[in-house]
């Protein structure tokens, strides 16, 4: 009896060189974080090789002996090469990818978290302000986890900072450009709160 096949569609958060022949892919999709092995391409092919932050559809063969599954077929649905053209956006995308790798293993209702990630990577691709993207993403992630981020962190800010944060968090990215320079201290404040008050690794 052959091993069962599974199909996923998600975003590549990490590629790790594990051997001469295989790469380890870490992919976050609507049903959570998945890891699988893909054979390295050794010859020219019309098939686009999956890369960091790409959105992919993958069919993989699950291993009956509890080992990592192997990719049987894949298709790159959306490449995000524009992220790498802006260093700040690339660094921001890497930060969010690490955050999901550290905290995305046992999430309930993973589809909500995938939507947050998907929207963030679209924004990075469009070269919006990285600290603002991260602030909104971490805030939404915390809310989706059921953490009191609004009641504890947001309401604990000074009146001026709270007003700025509220505007940035609840307005479209394009409308908060004028406040971009005010965002990094808020992002640092939220990151500190997450490290001190929650079990999330940030």
Feature map (PLM): residue ranges:
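Non-catalytic alpha-helical scaffolds and adjoining flexible linkers that form interface surfaces
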Residues: 1-23, 28-202
């Amino acid at each position: 009896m052959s091993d069962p096949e599974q199909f996923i569609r998600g975003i590549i958060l990490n590629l790790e060189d594990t051997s001469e022949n295989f790469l380890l892919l870490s992919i976050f999709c609507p049903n959570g974080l998945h890891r699988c092995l893909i054979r390295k391409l050794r010859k020219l092919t019309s098939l686009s090789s999956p890369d960091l932050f790409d959105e992919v559809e993958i069919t993989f063969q699950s291993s009956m002996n509890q080992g990592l599954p192997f990719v049987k077929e894949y298709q790159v649905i959306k490449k995000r090469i524009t992220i790498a053209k802006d260093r700040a956006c690339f660094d921001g995308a890497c930060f969010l990818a690490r955050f999901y790798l550290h905290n995305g293993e046992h999430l309930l209702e993973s589809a909500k978290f995938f939507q947050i990630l998907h929207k963030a990577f679209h924004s990075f691709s469009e070269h919006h302000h990285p600290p603002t993207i991260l602030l909104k993403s971490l805030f939404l992630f915390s809310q989706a986890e059921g953490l009191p981020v609004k009641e504890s962190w947001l309401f604990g800010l000074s009146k001026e900072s709270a007003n700025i944060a509220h505007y940035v968090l609840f307005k479209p990215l394009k409308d908060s450009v004028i406040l971009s320079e005010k965002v990094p201290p808020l992002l640092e404040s939220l990151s500190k709160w997450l490290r001190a008050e929650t079990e999330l690794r940030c």
